[in-house]
């Protein structure tokens, strides 16, 4: 076993959710409360990559804290009846890792109860730890706090853990904690995102199967 604990991001790493749920939800929110404003799927991916969703809402759409609360409530209602599908192969990775004695954690910008629902609906093993959007803002990634808490609760050393994430906040969090990071490149083909992740991540995987090969094959695969 290369790593005793795998820390998964949720959206666009474990489940295909931005293109199918989160972006359509945001477009509906803009139509309802910011008529005339728009956001393409590529723009949504890029702004979530950097500077992040909250900064995008502040900077691009002028949302104050009250508007952010309204957007969050709109989003929470929208996702409550829509379950994203796990990427093919993710379930097999998690089941094999758990069967070999490994642990699974989730650090995400989705709410913890939605994450657990998605895991159940997709037949994924229940995570040992979940840190989601319900945490205070200063305890959400890219803050190192949730990963520091994983280290504290498990007693593992940084090199026994692998963070798997598709966006920069996860990378920044892992780097701040000295934890190995694997970039999940299977959600989109946006050059700016792929270029950054390939340049700065020692591990970059364009497919779920490539990640599985690295984790479980003796030789590993990049």
Language-model regions: role of each:
Residues 86, 107, 139:
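Residue-level marker of regulatory loop/turn positions in helix-turn-helix DNA-binding domains and
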């Amino acid at each position: 076993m290369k790593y005793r604990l795998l820390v998964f991001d949720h959206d666009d790493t474990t489940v295909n959710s931005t293109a199918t749920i989160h972006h359509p939800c945001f477009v509906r929110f803009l139509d309802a409360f910011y008529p005339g404003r728009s956001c393409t799927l590529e723009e949504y991916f890029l702004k979530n990559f950097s500077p992040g969703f909250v900064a995008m809402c502040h900077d691009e759409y002028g949302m104050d804290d009250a508007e952010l609360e309204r957007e969050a409530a709109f989003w929470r209602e929208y996702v409550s009846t829509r379950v994203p599908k796990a990427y093919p192969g993710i379930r097999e990775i998690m089941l094999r890792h758990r069967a070999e004695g490994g642990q699974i954690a989730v650090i995400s910008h989705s709410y913890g109860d939605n994450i657990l629902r998605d895991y159940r609906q997709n037949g994924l093993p229940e995570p040992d730890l979940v840190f989601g959007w319900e945490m205070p803002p200063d305890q959400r990634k890219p803050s190192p706090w949730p990963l520091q808490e994983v280290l504290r609760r498990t007693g593992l050393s940084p090199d026994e853990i692998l963070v798997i994430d598709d966006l920069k906040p996860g990378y920044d969090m892992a780097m701040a904690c000295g934890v190995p990071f694997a970039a999940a490149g299977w959600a989109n083909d946006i050059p700016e995102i792929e270029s950054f992740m390939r340049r700065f991540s020692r591990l970059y995987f364009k497919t779920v199967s490539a990640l599985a090969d690295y984790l479980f094959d003796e030789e590993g695969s990049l």
